[in-house]
Amino acid sequence: MKRRTFLQQLLIASGVGLSGCQPHEIRRGISLAQKLENGDVGSAVASQIPGSGVAPLDQLVRKQLANLIDELAAKWGDDKVASPKEYVKYTDKYLTRAIINFESGAIRVETIDPDQSRQKLHDGIVSTLLTPENPAKVDLLSSEAIETGQTPFLKGLVRDTDNKAIWTQWRAKRYADHLLKTAYQQDRYHDKDRHFVTFHMVQNHQASQANQYADQVLRQSRRFGIPTDLTYAIIETESSFNPYAMSHIPAYGLMQIVPTSAGRDAYQLLHKEAGTPSKNYLFQPNKNIEMGTAYLHILNTRYLARVRDPQTRQYCVIAGYNTGSGNVLKAFDSNRDRAFAKINALSPDQTYQHLRQHLKYAEARNYLKKVTQVQKRYQA
């Protein structure tokens, strides 16, 4: 999606106005909001923020995006922002960026900084390799430097020339030196000199990621009565195991939870009280998997519980995870009772074919196909 379209959708959806906000005020506001969310300020100030803190944070995020869009477009001349399967992080006053594609496994670090370009590229490689798995330490929507020193989220996914996992400054710097010697490239990009390197994750990176989250997937799937192969299939389809996945809706994390819809339903189930999960909460893999499987449980046992056949219901749950249970039922009939009756009169295969043909949105129709195909690879 084009970055400007992305912005427009966010702004239309939120109704956020942009007048009267200067760049430094927006950045200061973002910083304050994050500190509040992370509990870094006094309780007197924090008590003035709504319980979830999500509405103010979302407004600030949207304002920041709107303020920075023209600056980024002017500097890079393209539309590269974070997406569900691609991590994008800008540093060096938006002159350097890292792009990690979790689907292909390609990693690209590039800079258009005209001064000390090789050093900036070297620094960008090191910070990318050492980006921590703790989401509170990484702001995808600013050019702030990454605070390293914790376990990197790429640990084990990238190996150096000794085939060793990279998790120390020494090893990251040495590998950056190697990349600058062997993979450095330069070209002319939108009238600017661009310096970049491209390297790759290990060949079986998605399997490695799946294994990393295996304990939590198994634990939460058993807890909520969800087949583990379905949980894995949804994670892969939604984010390709990108823990920093973020979409324009916005949805966050491995299972792409929308805070104000699935997030609220899952929060209520998990905490027995109303609430909305924050962005940083959903960027935590364990929390995200817990919420995602909880929402699958809600679809399975509440919204679509009247579907009698387990396999038929699973097809409906998969489609419902993407488009909502209401749209699933409307694919059969505008009346809920009649919709359930029609579903229960069909075989699982007939239901699958009907959904593939009659779901309102092409995305949902394709989603059902993708998840069921991926699911087969995770079946024992």
Question: Language model features by range: what are they?
Answer:
Residues 248-275, 290-298, 345-346, 371:
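Substrate-binding/active-site groove segments that recognize
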Residues 194-201, 270-279:
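Short glycine/proline-rich turn/loop motifs
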